[in-house]
UniProtKB/Swiss-Prot annotation:
SMART domains: LINK (SM00445). The lineage of its organism: Eukaryota, Metazoa, Chordata, Craniata, Vertebrata. Pfam families: Xlink (PF00193). The chain crosses the membrane at residues 575-595. It comes from Homo sapiens. One of its GO terms (cellular component) is membrane. It comes from the Eukaryota. Residues 36-574 are extracellular. This is Sushi domain-containing protein 5.
Length: 629
């Protein structure tokens, strides 16, 4: 009697556990998360708390057309690719590979894998991620095409293979090169230095990093024209043409090669924003690092379309030679670009054309002399006619709260002596400026500065305020005035020096606040170059004749100085001055409040429209007037 084999139902029952395990594995695969980086990718559990066993990792990679990476493949990926996944996963031989990450140097500190650790004895039954590499016939895709370039040969389309390109007949490469190669790296990308083929010696270097898709070509005609124009401009600039070729180098990272060059590269960004402009970049992973782009003052450069209004209060002076904020100015033609960059970019100025895009700041150079970042001209201390006309439109004579105080170098400080109850300062043609006399103790009533001959003085009208610039000596008339009598204690030993910073443009505005009479006396000197300011009052001035040629000038006697016990007491002077100043400030604040309230009352009503829908808006409009209380 022969023994019968197991019946078909029995065989199905024996296979059920294996089928259930396979079904559970297939159901679990979609819940895996994938972190891909080109040809290399990582499979791990969805929640990150549980990994995969070795067999499950193999099946997971195989289901996605890949296989577990070997130790050599993992090292090659970390070395050549910009791999930013830090994890521990299964390798093909059952060992564990761990990618060690570190933050890169520079402004953008990005985590990047820099090393690999191999663990040959993993914990039995442990679960880890799966380190997979794709199994494709063309990991880098079809060979790219370039203008006037012929693909002469190739070793293959797998990882590590190279493509050899030569120029078409009648075209040559720059730097006397005859061919260039592209490498299919472990990241699944064609990588290398692309030489542009042209009809002359003009050259262009391109770091090929996905700049050219596989299905299209990019024209280099505009790039060649821009390069020729920039080369001509560089020859006229001197040493600018010698610095550019030194920077046309590239970081070459080749699988299986030991020589690795690390340097800067010029990347013409054809097909990207700002076509035709030279962009400094680090390769691989070139990034635009140009920052801190500023304009020079608009008064020095008058170029259509590039002028920019700059407020005098917000102008900054930049000093050349600073490592962090150096301004590289290329002197020469007005058509020269000057790009202000930091130390991250290549050294030397970048010279380009005027038709650049992407918002490159462009200024034209000037032959004028420069002092502290501003052009020095003959009229540096005077207003332009346009500014005087704008100031003339304000001719109501009032002094605004936001007006600047008149500060001129080496000019005497003028003290306004007014009635104690006055709240605002309203200049007029008859305004008198009393100057503090640097002599002994004087009982000053009022001293008025008036020109000798009105016809011999020139005045510049600024509203109701008149600024006199005289070339003749002034005479001083002592007159009685109903103003409050002020006492000053002035000694030659307590004079202080007032340092006045040089300003570019001095607005012809009078001070908006009255200077306190208790201010310490100051001593200034009049420049000998330009006699455009009133003379200082001193004892030597009253003891001699004026230097001017006027014959009708008279020298009136000055006030007698008091000596001994006859001098009036000065104990109440500072107190009275303080009270007067406080009252003036309070009245000024009250006036500001009244003006603000008046303006607010002018806009007391607003009209609003009611949106009632698209259909009803044709036949019905409703207005609501709301009055502010």
């Amino acid at each position: 009697m022969t023994a019968e084999g197991p019946s078909p139902p029995a065989r199905w029952h024996r296979r059920l556990p294996g089928l259930w395990a396979a079904a559970l594995l297939l159901l679990g695969l979609p819940r895996l998360s994938v972190r891909a980086d080109g040809k290399f990718f990582v499979l791990e559990s969805q929640n990150g708390s549980q990994g995969l066993q070795l067999e499950a990792a193999r099946l997971s990679c195989k289901s996605r057309g890949a296989h577990l990476a070997s130790a050599d493949e993992l090292r090659r990926v970390v070395q050549d690719c910009s791999f930013a996944v830090c994890t521990t996963g299964w390798l093909a031989d059952g060992t564990l590979g761990t990618t060690v990450c570190s933050k890169g140097s520079g402004e953008q500190q990005i985590m990047r894998a820099v090393d690999v650790r191999i663990e040959s004895n993993p914990v039995p039954g442990g679960t880890y991620s799966a380190l997979c590499i794709k199994d494709e016939e063309k990991p880098c895709g079809d060979p790219p095409s370039f203008p006037h370039t012929i693909l002469q040969g190739r070793t293959g389309l797998e990882m590590g293979d190279e493509l050899l390109y030569v120029c078409a007949p009648g075209h040559i490469m720059g730097h006397r090169e005859t061919a260039f190669t592209l490498l299919c790296n472990s990241c699944g990308e064609w990588y290398g230095l692309v030489q542009a083929c042209g009809k002359d010696e003009a050259e262009a270097h391109i770091d090929y990093e996905d700049n050219f898709p596989d299905d299209r070509s990019v024209s280099f005609r505009e790039l060649m024209e821009d390069s020729r124009t920039e080369a001509d401009e560089d020859r006229g600039q001197g040493d600018s043409s010698e610095e550019a070729p030194k920077q046309d180098r590239l970081v070459s990272i080749s699988v299986g090669r030991e020589n690795i060059a690390r340097d800067k590269v010029f990347v013409p960004t054809t097909g990207l924003p700002g076509a035709g402009s030279s962009v400094p970049a680090d390769s691989p992973g070139s990034r635009l690092l140009q920052k801190h782009l500023f304009w020079f003052p608009a008064e020095a450069f008058h170029k259509p379309g590039l002028e920019k209004e700059v407020d005098d209060d917000t102008k900054k002076q930049f000093s050349a030679g600073d490592n962090h904020s150096g301004v590289k100015l290329v002197p020469g033609e007005p058509e020269t670009k000057v790009i202000y960059g930091n130390t991250d970019g290549p050294s030397g100025p970048f010279v380009g054309k005027n038709d650049s895009k992407a918002g490159d700041p462009v200024v034209s150079s000037s032959d004028e002399s420069w002092l502290d970042g501003y052009p020095v001209t003959e009229g540096a201390w005077r207003k332009t006619e346009a500014e005087e006309e704008e100031d003339g439109d304000r001719g109501d004579g009032s002094v605004g709260l936001d007006e600047n105080v008149l500060v001129t170098p080496d000019q005497p400080i003028l003290v306004e002596v007014k009635k104690p109850k006055s709240s605002t300062l309203t200049p007029s043609e008859g305004m008198t400026h009393s100057s503090v006399l640097p002599s002994q103790m004087l009982d000053v009533e009022a001293l008025a500065l008036r020109p000798v001959n009105a016809s011999e003085t020139e005045g510049i009208g600024d509203g109701d305020l008149t600024k006199y610039q005289s070339t003749l000596p002034w005479r001083f008339i002592t007159e009685e005035s109903p103003m409050a009598t002020l006492s000053y204690e002035l000694t030659s030993s307590t004079l202080e020096i007032l340092t006045v910073n040089t300003v570019k443009q001095t607005p012809n505005h009078i001070p908006s606040t009255i200077m306190a009479t208790t201010q310490p006396p100051v001593e200034t000197t009049v420049p000998e170059i330009q006699d455009s300011f009133p003379y200082l009052l001193s004892e030597d001035f009253f003891g001699q004749e004026g230097p001017g040629p006027g014959a009708s000038e008279e020298l009136h006697p000055t006030l007698e100085s008091c000596v001994g016990d006859g001098c009036p007491g000065l104990s109440r002077g500072p107190v009275i001055a303080t009270i007067v100043t406080v009252l003036c400030l309070l009245l000024l604040l009250a006036g500001v409040g009244m003006v603000w309230g008046y303006r607010k009352c002018q806009h007391k009503s607003s009209v609003y429209k009611l949106n009632v829908g698209q259909r009803q808006a044709r036949h019905y409009h409703q207005q609501i007037e709301m009055e502010k209380v």
